[in-house]
């Protein structure tokens, strides 16, 4: 289905696809809620705090997330803002789900980094920034929780620059903090935006004034705090570098805004910055060539699979990032890995757990495809061309458990459940060749809890996890059939097959792995597997 190039260019230019990265509890889910509120996607923001009411945050839609108040899976939300279409991918803030987050960052064109003003740059933010660095992702920064006592803003900027190695250009500067938070001064507009308490869950007109020196502002802050503000503002203005769009697009410079997501203050400025500076959908690499967003032929890749988004339907949805062309309902596309043509007439668009049938989608959009076990993470879909999008990895897990079933009659349901949940990519299943064990691998302990909970809730299977003497796993590859056969014979007791049918080596210790690598230099022991 060809699309008019003019229409396509217009639609591409309107789109912004981004993710929020932060350390747990920096306010990411609250920010997501408020962004949706500004996009008029939800009428009253469901606060994350407390969790005593029935109103859970829109983006935390799975039952375990709602019980525990942590974002575990990546939610996808689309909303309009000022004549643009914004696609927001919410990522898990918990460290155990870094793989899911990593893959999500392959599907976005920019990221919003949230920093807790009281805590500064935290460990998880550093890790996520490393991932963004590898992909030169443009970063917008938001220092959150100004309605509480925060650290000295100059100190925070210095920390972001030194720890994360990215130049900061403040867009706004805070006037006071905590109980005395008055608002922010916009450095390029020479305007003050005044903060009003108690309007966190709604959109209200924000009062603005030219300049910043007003008697009531001085009075609210007190003379001492006001002169401290003036002093820090002067220092910032003296040291301020001009915002360089090229450096921003390379991920080397970040505009910094201050505010409070809970108080819904500064959120619209984030959206305005996103619309003004963040790039529209970019080109994507494949093994064959670079695919540009404005190409008229449809293409896209799957970066995530989610089982049981709707427990009533027992379904699996593959999340596909559109890279070029246009999706139209009922169109025929090629599932490249299988070499098969499929007709897609039931693709979905999302607002977290809510889904709607989709008529059309453009580059930058995320669409949901119903998956009956044939789609894997990393799969490419095109309008016929042999293209394989690259850079969507599987990481070697760091923790392993043997899965023990409480009711042996449920083994079929257990296998199905583990297979489907591992397709999501947060855990991996290994089947040793020596016995009938099922070994589950993950990057963090929380994932085992999540799997046990979801097996019980969604598949009615109860199981326990036992420790197992596996230190690490490596994917095996060897071009020489004779050497591979020799290796398989010698290493038989340590070999297994993963959920995708790939040969793996389960190393009982790091020393053992090293010895095997030395003994078989022609065999590749890889700690990642590209999809």
Swiss-Prot record:
One of its GO terms (cellular component) is cytosol. GTP binds at residues 22-29, 90-94, 144-147. It comes from the Bacteria. The keyword Nucleotide-binding applies. One of its GO terms (molecular function) is GTPase activity. Residues 13-282 form the tr-type G domain. It holds the Pfam family GTP_EFTU. It is found in: Cytoplasm. InterPro entries: EF-G-like_DII, EFG_III/V, G_TR_CS, P-loop_NTPase, PrfC, RF3_C, RF3_dom_3_sf, RF3_GTP-bd. GO terms for biological process: regulation of translational termination. NCBIfam families: prfC, PRK00741.1, small_GTP. Increases the formation of ribosomal termination complexes and stimulates activities of RF-1 and RF-2. It binds guanine nucleotides and has strong preference for UGA stop codons. It may interact directly with the ribosome. The stimulation of RF-1 and RF-2 is significantly reduced by GTP and GDP, but not by GMP. Belongs to the TRAFAC class translation factor GTPase superfamily. Classic translation factor GTPase family. PrfC subfamily. PANTHER family: PEPTIDE CHAIN RELEASE FACTOR RF3 (PTHR43556:SF2). This is Peptide chain release factor 3. It comes from Psychrobacter sp. (strain PRwf-1).
């Amino acid at each position: 289905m060809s699309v008019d190039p003019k229409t396509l260019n217009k639609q591409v230019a309107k789109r912004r696809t981004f993710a929020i990265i932060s350390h747990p509890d920096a306010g990411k889910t609250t920010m997501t809620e408020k962004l949706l509120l500004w996009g008029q996607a939800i009428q009253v923001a469901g606060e994350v705090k407390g969790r005593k009411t029935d109103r859970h945050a829109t983006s935390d839609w799975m039952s375990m997330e709602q019980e525990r108040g942590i974002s575990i899976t990546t939610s996808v939300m689309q909303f309009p803002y000022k004549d643009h279409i914004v696609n927001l991918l919410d990522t898990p803030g918990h460290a155990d789900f870094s793989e899911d987050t990593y893959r999500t960052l392959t599907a976005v064109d920019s990221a919003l980094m949230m920093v807790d003003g009281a805590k500064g740059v935290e460990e998880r933010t550093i890790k996520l920034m490393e991932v963004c660095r590898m992909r030169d992702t443009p970063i917008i920064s938001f220092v959150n929780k100004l309605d509480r006592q925060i650290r000295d803003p100059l100190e925070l900027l210095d920390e972001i620059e030194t720890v994360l190695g990215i130049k900061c250009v403040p867009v706004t500067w805070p006037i006071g903090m905590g109980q005395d938070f008055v608002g922010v001064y916009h450095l390029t507009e020479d305007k003050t935006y005044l903060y009003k308490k108690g309007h966190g869950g709604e959109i209200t007109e924000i009062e603005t004034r030219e300049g910043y020196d007003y008697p009531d502002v001085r009075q609210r802050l007190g003379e001492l705090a006001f002169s401290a503000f003036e002093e820090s503002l002067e220092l910032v203005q003296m040291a301020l570098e001009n915002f360089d769009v090229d450096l921003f697009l390379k991920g080397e410079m970040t505009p910094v805004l201050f505010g409070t997501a809970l108080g819904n203050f500064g959120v619209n400025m984030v959206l305005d910055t996103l619309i003004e500076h963040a790039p529209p959908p970019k080109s994507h690499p494949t093994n064959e060539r670079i695919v540009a967003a404005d190409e008229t032929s449809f293409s896209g890749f799957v970066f995530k699979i989610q089982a049981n988004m709707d427990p009533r339907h027992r379904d699996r949805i593959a999340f596909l990032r559109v890279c070029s062309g246009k999706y139209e309902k009922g169109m025929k596309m090629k599932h490249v890995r299988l070499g098969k043509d499929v007709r897609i007439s039931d693709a979905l668009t999302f607002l977290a757990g809510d889904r709607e049938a989709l008529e059309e989608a453009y580059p930058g959009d995320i669409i949901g495809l119903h998956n009956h076990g044939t789609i894997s993470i990393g799969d490419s879909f095109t309008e016929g061309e042999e293209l394989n999008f690259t850079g969507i990895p599987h990481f070697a897990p760091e923790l392993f458990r043997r899965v023990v079933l409480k009711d042996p009659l449920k083994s079929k349901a257990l296998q199905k459940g583990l297979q489907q949940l591992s397709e999501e990519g947060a855990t991996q299943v290994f089947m040793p060749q020596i016995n009938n064990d099922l070994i589950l691998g993950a990057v963090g302990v929380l994932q085992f809890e999540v799997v046990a909970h979801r097996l019980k809730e969604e598949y009615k299977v109860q199981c326990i996890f036992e420790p197992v003497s596996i230190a690490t796993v490596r994917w095996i590859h060897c071009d020489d059939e004779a050497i591979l056969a020799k290796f398989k014979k010698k290493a038989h007791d340590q070999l297994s097959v993963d959920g995708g049918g790939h040969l793996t080596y389960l190393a009982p210790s790091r020393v053992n792995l090293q010895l095997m690598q030395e003994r078989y230099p022609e065999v590749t022991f890889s700690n990642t597997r590209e999809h």
